[in-house]
């Protein structure tokens, strides 16, 4: 049901800034490391990162051989490894190197998930990995992708997406329950139980078992009796094996102490959709239909196409990005909050995912118009400046993610007078949504069939999903249907009960751009994007009506925004063009991403509001992972927070066959 909000816009924006959810935030402290006798040590734990007899050899003998690798992955299209303790990344690099040397099927995928509380900073990791010259091409790629050290899931892709590292930063007691995967192999690593007992306790082993495939394997250098008994208590059969180097013994395990039918029943009630898909859902033809070719729909199509799906993409317009995604530029930046609420955590994860997607698609096509100019979020007064300082200090964010600039620093960077300081996001910038859509469709062109000027009037489920035109003619059918309808969610009864509010937004363009070439994007109560070929872009209004044509009052409102940011320049700048789009906003300001009806194969990537450029890439990754039965790229509570069924106990249950409203 489409709604128009009666709440004041200022009140709604304040709610969006503060957020509705309080969560626990883990500040990430980089590891302190030093070499002693040629071996890397962690002084905080008084322990070594690897055996004195060789790190690569230890990874190969203990973790690869201990899990019967590479033999077990040779005939697998997807293989999932879960590691406790990323350390310096040797286990990942050794596994990746072995996989690329033994697996030659271009459709095969390696998924490596690793949890780490104290990651190395980029400089230390560079120094530590330098001696491992046989792994240099891989370690260099890892260093290029190494993220800012902030809490959460960081999904890094290599080998054109054939290898995925999900690096989870935070305390294992907080992060492991948030993970959803089906591990074929576990690398049980970490500092010794005497030095770091919480990495090896009963609670951790129990949660590892919940993420493991039936007959999945486990390997560790640790043979402590308490660890062995925990593993056996939670379903693993374990055996001692000859150890590596000076270590006399090691352990190998297999998750098979319960009957397989009992495991299947456990999967049914475990709420682990990855295990459930692998064990209970028949393999269907990898065909999907997507309705809507804005940013969300195009990125969804590309992600599935890269995983081997055949896609039919429908849109009522003559090409992609004709509605809200048709603005000349949008802003790339995360959202911060004092309590690190769900919106902030989702925005952070999605921001990093979007940067990865941009890098990947730009390397493939070279056609995306985008500039990593940085983004300044300017405080409006001293009170807000104090809040900005407080947020960064409270969470201990690293400077390569965000930092607070004092007024003189901000003025030097931006070239404008700054009164109170600002947040500065150095990895932020602007992006042309239309060029992103075109690049996504180009990258997936071999498997994407685009149907332009093809409105979908109705959808129905008769075995597979079918999309029909206004005459009732079937346009295509597939087992999976994904709705990326933007402002048109009300047009189908299957989405009519999703309460979505539309907000009009008008932007204004100015042909003359007086800003220096390196000026960052400027944000306050609105934004100014400099550096475009078409000049300046200013926006955007937030209106409670559906007037599709530009209006003079909205132009004046945008010009006032410009005047507040650059009062000395604004009188000389004249508007040259305006454009109107509509944001589709859910009532809690979070998107609608996931299964509308999981047993029926109906999915949503809607309700993106003003954050479609940031959220769409993560939405595509999440749904693609759910469909493939691979590790999910988001924490469980974030997945619940964006689920279309979150507003009712029973979730959304669409009609199987219904005519359009």
Language-model segment annotations:
Residues 471-480:
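Core beta-strand elements of the Rossmann-like FAD/NAD(P) dinucleotide-binding domain
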Residues 24-80, 96-134, 645:
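Rossmann-like AdoMet
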